[in-house]
Regions:
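A conserved active-site cap/scaffold subdomain adjacent to cofactor or substrate pockets
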Residues: 202, 208-289
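N-terminal active-site segment of His-dependent metallophosphoesterases
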Residues: 1-69, 390, 394-404, 411-418
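Glycine-rich phosphate-binding loop signature in dinucleotide/nucleotide-binding domains
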Residues: 43-47, 152-155, 303-307
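Conserved beta-strand elements of the Class I
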Residues: 5, 131-133, 245-247
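Accessory, non-catalytic peripheral segments of nucleic-acid enzymes
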Residues: 253-418
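His/Asp/Glu-rich metal-coordinating catalytic cores
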Residues: 50, 61-225, 229-235, 250
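A structural signal for the main folded, soluble domain(s) of proteins
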Residues: 1, 32, 37, 45, ...
């Protein structure tokens, strides 16, 4: 029996937002360090025989000294526990320059049984009769000489590992990772013509089997598995049914492979159902946004807690520039102070959609309004007016807001005079 820990897409050194922890480290960067440390502790606890890392150990080809030292220390923890490490270079570990060396190569420490490869093709006998075939990402498509040499070894168990995209036989489309430079497609023949016992891949950040109909099991019998990323990089990474962390593979004495999904805690993320603002007032939109924000707050209210601060997004659809300018942004911001990142992207309603029969009648009802209704009159007018059509959309909201402020100041002067 052989126990293998399958890791990939650690992305050590990934940063986002400007929040720092008490040590002065970017909070999202620290999230990655915590996740890797937990994974290493799990691997040691489960007494795995080896660790396979299918690329993207680092998030960038120029990681910081802190990032390098942290990852080195984690790999050395494994080595101290008698667990060899086999890592290959992914697209984030490298750049586009042929002469440059993959950043992950600095981790190579064969005397400690830490093998971090950037070579085109390497084979390790990781246990008696078990061979690990490793193909790194660097200059992948230029490896015309290497490709014919990639072959399984008859009479042994053969595991193939590399970093890249494949064609999903169920979806009949290339699997893709957002915000991913130098993405390559693994040749189909390389996966099918070598009778691999199992294929353990990296690059796609959602864990699971290629061609799976249920997202949880190998329904298509491909024996091709992506471990997914160690942490979720905001909304660029999709939710994952199998969670994120590492995968424990056990090879039985009969050569069978069984998997156990291991997860590590993730920072909470909330992507709320978009609010359709077409039939709502600015006040109603504001209330809905705040209601959703409050649902993500800790018991203490809108208090920022670095370890658990959520990432939150609320999309607003079919809103007009005037209505968006009238949102109570101060109240919304006050209820978002607990978040690590808060985003409220909006899509504007087109003028043609907005000119309904009801809006055409608004002007007929404006005569005789009191001064107290001036802002309401302005908001109604701006929603069905063509006045702003000649202004670019990115400027329209700013112009509308400033005009509304001007009307408000005039209204306040009139009311004070009355």
């Amino acid at each position: 029996m052989v126990k293998i820990a399958h890791l990939s897409d650690i992305h050590a050194g990934y940063t986002a937002t400007r929040h720092l922890n008490s040590q002065g480290i970017n909070i999202r960067e620290a999230d990655g360090y915590v996740a890797l440390s937990r994974i290493v502790s799990d691997c040691i606890k489960h007494e795995v025989d080896l660790v396979v890392i299918a690329g993207d150990t680092f998030h960038t080809s120029t990681p910081s000294i802190r990032t390098i030292i942290f990852v080195q220390n984690q790999f050395r923890r494994l080595a101290a526990a008698g667990i060899p490490v086999y890592a290959l270079a992914g697209n984030h570990d490298t750049d586009d320059i042929r002469a440059n060396i993959a950043a992950s190569r600095v981790l190579d420490d064969p005397l400690r049984e830490i093998h971090s490869h950037a070579e085109p093709y390497v084979v390790h006998e990781v246990a008696d009769g078990v061979n690990l075939h490793m193909v790194s990402h660097h200059m992948y498509m230029d490896q015309a000489i290497t490709m014919p040499d990639i072959k399984s070894i008859p009479g042994t168990i053969n595991i193939f590992t590399t970093h890249g995209s494949v064609i999903d036989p169920l979806l009949e489309m290339k699997l893709h990772t957002e915000q991913s430079p130098r993405e390559i497609v693994i040749p189909d023949w390389l996966l099918k013509e070598n009778d691999w016992d199992y294929i353990m891949l990296g690059h796609i950040h959602e864990r699971g089997w290629v061609g799976s109909a249920d997202g949880s099991t190998d329904t298509s019998g491909t024996r091709i598995f992506y471990n997914g990323s160690a942490i979720r990089r905001g909304f660029a990474d999709k939710p994952c049914k199998l969670g994120r962390g590492w995968t424990l593979w056990t090879i039985g004495d009969d050569g069978s492979f069984t998997s156990e999904i291991m997860t590590v805690p993730q920072r909470p993320q909330y992507d709320f159902t978009p609010i359709d603002a077409s039939s709502l007032s600015a006040s109603e939109v504001t209330d809905k946004v705040i209601e959703n924000l409050v649902s993500t707050q800790p018991e203490q209210g809108a208090e920022f807690i670095a370890a658990t601060a959520p990432i939150v997004r609320q999309k607003i659809e079919n809103i007009t520039p005037g209505k968006k300018a009238a949102l109570d942004l101060k109240a919304i911001s006050a209820n978002a102070t607990h978040t690590l990142h808060w985003d409220m992207p909006s899509s504007f309603m087109s003028r043609s959609d907005n000119l309904s029969e009801n809006s055409r009648k608004v002007s007929e009802d404006r005569t005789g309004k009191s001064n107290a209704d001036l802002l309401k009159i302005y908001d109604e007018w701006i929603e069905d007016s063509n006045t702003l059509d000649g202004i670019s959309e990115d400027m329209r909201e700013n112009v509308s807001r400033k005009a509304r402020d001007f009307v408000r100041m005039g209204q306040e002067e009139v009311l004070s005079a009355e």
